[in-house]
Amino acid sequence: VLELRETIAASDALLVVTPEYNGSLPGQLKNMLDWASRPRVGAVLREKTVAVIGASPSPSGARTAQADARRVLTRAGALVIDSELVVPSAHARLGAGDRLGDEELALAVREVLLELRRAVRPAARDAALASIHRGRPSSGSCTAAPSFRRRTERSPR
């Protein structure tokens, strides 16, 4: 748990990719998010910029699990970007090993990652400026993130 908390604290942003088990996020993921959200003061998820992707062999693409993860992360104080990606029929769309199976999916994942990166940069700048105004060096934590309303959804070919 300490290593998890240190890794999240040292990151600029977090990408959560979740499958869907029985209409919700997996218990292991929920447990990890719970550990990262405590204690409330000093929680490593607080003000961390996060993107969530859902992938499932079902036609829904883990839409419910993705919504649950977004709700839990928001409740923990994370800054969850609005850009979403659900991957229905993931078993047919993922390639062997660490490769994405189709170009359309690869581009959709890249779009989410670019949105995440764009959300982190202004937040880090705002934190640095606020820190300068207070007369102390920046801790690098995020204080704000822009809102992205575009929904990115890909269906199988």
What are these regions (language model features)?
Residues 2-76:
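Helix-loop-strand module that forms the ligand-binding subsite of alpha/beta enzymes
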Residues 1-7, 109, 155:
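Short intrinsically disordered, low-complexity coil segments enriched in acidic
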Residues 79-157:
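Glycine-rich phosphate/pyrophosphate-binding loop and the adjoining helix
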